[in-house]
Amino acid sequence: MLNRFRPARLVAQSSRCLPLTRARAGPLPVNNARTLATRAAAVNTKEPTERDNITTLSNGVRVASEDLPDAFSGVGVYIDAGSRYENDYVRGASHIMDRLAFKSTSTRTADEMLETVEKLGGNIQCASSRESMMYQAATFNKAIPTAVELMAETIRDPKLTDEELEGQIMTAQYEVNEIWSKAELILPELVHMAAFKDNTLGNPLLCPKERLDYINRDVIQTYRDAFYRPERLVVAFAGVPHERAVKLAEKYFGDMKASDAPGLSRTGSETSVDSLVSESSEASSESSSSSSDSSESSGGLLSKLFSPKAKKATPNPFLTRVPISTEDLTRPAHYTGGFLTLPSQPPPLNPNLPTFTHIQLAFEGLAISDDDIYALATLQTLLGGGGSFSAGGPGKGMYSRLYTNVLNQHGWVESCVAFNHSYTDSGLFGIAASCYPGRTLPMLQVMCRELHALTTDHGYSALGELEVSRAKNQLRSSLLMNLESRMVELEDLGRQVQVHGRKIPVREMTRRINELTVKDLRRVAKRVVGGMANNAGQGSGAPTVVLQEATVQGLKTTELGWDQIQDTIAQWKLGRR
């Protein structure tokens, strides 16, 4: 530590020893000590969060590392897979693959695997999403090789016994029933299904209940053959030197054989969308024309989802073994928009318990690689929102628009919060709200009012410098605080390399947030809620609404039809019709 300051002291001592002489013209003598210190400082210009490296192995596996020292290190394997790429034959396999992680392999029994995982300490898990399958672990530094070994075994060489498969299908059935009992869990699923009808991001994240009887070893193996290939893998390390990370990845994944099967397009540019657009447009127009009868319009979508009342599946001639095709892998997400309504909630058995109407309004958002994604994230933070009751008392988020303009102004609103889902080639942006029964139309009008206010140039509701500055600061602080978690840091590294091919430095992200202006946010708001996202899938620009109304004894309510909902949204100049 003392050596760091030695050159500065030498400079000070030498200057005191110099004799006093008259200044002469000519070049000044070079101070070697000061020059060396300056050069050393110039070399280390990167911040600790920018010390990332990426290496591609000979078989296509990408190895990414970020060497931030800590007591814990992280390792994760990220696979280009997920529900958006599933065809009818493997529908729901992502969910079951998630459940089958860290079970028996050719070298360990399920009990031995569990025992080894428990000895590691820390956190080891598997999670599936619409666009990725993630195996992650945060553990002690010395246990990283063991964690990589366990991941390699469960990814490359699982036994997939009938007993394990049957057990996880039963667990999935319980999860399906559980999610239907919670509106905050099922409604986001339904929003995706209505927004991307019959394609890609509209595929259910969990296994449909009627599909559970068809999930077998052959379905799982078909899924693995399509996605578990070296060119689809990113192995990420946090807190591990890059040379060590590459050696571990080479040891456990370097001998995977590359496949000649079609690759994954992250933009959808490899496939013409003409046929897709025409097909989806027909489906969208049919939905729009018949959706005034809510039970009729929602039946098709609900039958594809994990309905709690789904009957036992009957043999389907179309569910023969069909490998994942090039079209399945490269099809862009086509936003259709639409309306979906759930059966009304019955009055609670306990009259003292409240019941609420739930409504979600969404528009096509932006792809994660879009230049305007930072502005859209700032708009979500600016809208903010939450619930009418805060366990911690007044505090964070109380100055967001949905708090000040909605929750604080309308006592019949239970919750109101903005959401923003971003994917590789599309997204969803909107507001989710819950209100007292009989207030559905006023609630929809309030939601439309707040979204429309983001686009206005003048007036009291127009965006202001102060609130935009506050939202930018909140977004930056949230980003930085989240990255303090080793697991979040690890997932951020792995997913960014998977999507962008590189790690975007935190300094770059915070700079781009800080550079945003009121005009930028207003322009992006007009683009998104105006139905002009213009993503690769050539979306319709129509709004998406998912509704579940509540009933109360003694209160008569009139169900809203799709035409009335569209008229209300159009009055606020939102979306396209």
UniProtKB/Swiss-Prot annotation:
Q: Which PROSITE patterns match?
A: INSULINASE
> What are the boundaries of the region Disordered?
259-301
Q: Where in the cell is it found?
A: Mitochondrion matrix
Cellular component terms per the entry's GO annotation: mitochondrial matrix; mitochondrion
Keywords, comma-separated and alphabetical: Mitochondrion, Transit peptide
Question: Where's the transit peptide in this chain?
Answer: 1-35
* Binding partners and assembly: Heterodimer of mpp (alpha) and pep (beta) subunits, forming the mitochondrial processing protease (MPP) in which mpp is involved in substrate recognition and binding and pep is the catalytic subunit.
Listed name of the protein: Mitochondrial-processing peptidase subunit alpha
Among the GO molecular function terms of this UniProt record, one is: metalloendopeptidase activity
Query: What role is this protein assigned?
Result: Substrate recognition and binding subunit of the essential mitochondrial processing protease (MPP), which cleaves the mitochondrial sequence off newly imported precursors proteins.
Q: What is known of its domains?
A: Appears to contain two domains of approximately equal size which are separated by a loop-like sequence.
Q: Which gene encodes it?
A: mpp
Gene3D superfamilies annotated for this entry?
Metalloenzyme, LuxS/M16 peptidase-like
Work out whether the entry's keyword set contains Zinc.
no
- Family, per the entry? Belongs to the peptidase M16 family.
Q: Which domain of life is it from?
A: Eukaryota
Q: Where is the composition biased (Low complexity)?
A: 269-301
Q: Which GO terms describe its biological process?
A: protein processing involved in protein targeting to mitochondrion
